[in-house]
């Protein structure tokens, strides 16, 4: 079960008076449940609520049309995705793909607001049985098409010789350990918070829990520079920076696209690259990727 916060703990987390917490529940939709007369708050839902209410998107743009040559991707960052965008721009002169690093939650919200054509996301669902569908259904008026990009290995980055003997999330409770974390709204942060809950650890008691960086590579660079001992990131970063890696789980990383633009030529050209030899070669050169299902439409596990 996810860790539940008390009213006092939520007030401390949000830096507000306890009475204001009840106002937020009644008027602003702060996620809460009442058990035996006592209000309790799932921490990860509170964090999502904060993220949803602090991102201010500009006015909507029109979805991609057939005479446009621009693809805007937004959401979770990924090393292989960066390389794929470069491959697209090189393969289709006169077309341009660009990426906005908003985290998985921000990407789905950008798709909802027509601020991007493709959202990249790896948001694990409440029961951990699937990815992205639950969040897309709650954020988007119409369910987007989900296309698999890759399965990738998530875990903990450590120094090459792992001097602190970190072998699981439970080891993050060791005294003196310094964590570097990912930003709220990222799928990696959501995964880490879930794993901390399972291990019975509180993030606010871990040094560096609030030390947030925007990209997987930034986590590795903080460890490489000696400013942190451990942080959540994908295995490909460990390979790129010669760091140690503690695997946690394989996850599905999807690309979400609205049905209105799915069949547009630039979109189909981008997805077509996911089944090309150059794409597979790039994936083989990076540790921690499985692209056997890349480019295929994904359907919910429990239909």
Enumerate the predicted regions with their spans:
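Flexible hinge/capping segments at coil-to-helix
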Residues: 149, 158-179
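N-terminal hydrophobic or amphipathic helices and topogenic motifs
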Residues: 1-106, 112-115, 138-143, 169, ...
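Short helix-initiation/N-cap motifs at beta->coil->alpha
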Residues: 100-109, 204-221
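Short beta-strand-centered segments that line the small-molecule binding cleft or hinge
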Residues: 107-153
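A ligand-binding cleft/hinge motif common to bilobed small-molecule-binding domains
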Residues: 122-136, 220-249
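Periplasmic-binding protein-like
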Residues: 3, 146-153, 239, 243-272, ...
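Short loop->beta-strand "edge-of-pocket" segments that line small-molecule binding or catalytic clefts
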Residues: 67-77, 170-190
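Ligand-binding cleft/hinge of the Venus flytrap
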Residues: 85-93, 170, 182-184, 188-211
